[in-house]
Amino acid sequence: MKITFLGHAAFLVEEEGLKFLFDPFLTGNPQAKIRPDEITADYILVSHGHGDHLGDTVAIAQRSGATVIGVFELCNFLSRQNVKTHPMHIGGRYNFGQFTVKLTPAWHGSSFGEGPVEYLGNPCGFLLSVGGKTLYHTGDTGLFYDMKLLAEIDPVDILLVPIGGNFTMDVKDALKALELVKPKYAIPMHYNTWPVIAADVGEFQDKGRALGVAIKVLNPGEMVVL
């Protein structure tokens, strides 16, 4: 599985000849090293409607013909903008043929716009199972104990986990998430984009490895094959 970190919570995952794009916030992202018109995808998985996650979804989906996977309300919003969608809801699992997706809970919010905002359903995370591996992108979330249950049902190979605090888990809570999920690998996200989510990634790396998890810290634009 080839994973490219695009900055913040955005990732491009490639496996089985398919491209999965998570939370493609590129325009306005101080960490991004790539423009929206330089990327294509078969599927875009959007965890919630905040601008730093919904990001460039519409432009990329319209240009590439990608199908957006997310909660029902978010997909309804995107369908009105001529975007192909596959609506789901938390706890739902769907077999797309070459891969399966399960939506997981996330403790956060989800709305779009300034001034009067549009409610876009509950935030979520994703369990993507493809090519014999399962990747868990938690979305923006605080720590919750049912992460353990999720991983008991679908053992996780790769965990993409926020560590920046303030809006999500911080390093301390993300380390507890490692104990609950017990992934083989973990990649930190959602940190150091702005000062309010500054985090010591070295601490997460050292303490995570002490728990027996292979921690892969990626710079924006960097890729790893797992």
UniProtKB/Swiss-Prot annotation:
PANTHER family: UPF0173 METAL-DEPENDENT HYDROLASE MJ1163 (PTHR43546:SF3), UPF0173 METAL-DEPENDENT HYDROLASE MJ1163-RELATED (PTHR43546). The keyword Hydrolase applies. This is UPF0173 metal-dependent hydrolase CHY_0920. It comes from the Bacteria. SUPFAM superfamilies: Metallo-hydrolase/oxidoreductase. It holds the Pfam family Lactamase_B_3. Belongs to the UPF0173 family. InterPro entries: Metallo-B-lactamas, RibonucZ/Hydroxyglut_hydro, UPF0173, UPF0173_UPF0282_UlaG_hydrolase. One of its GO terms (molecular function) is hydrolase activity. Keywords: Hydrolase.
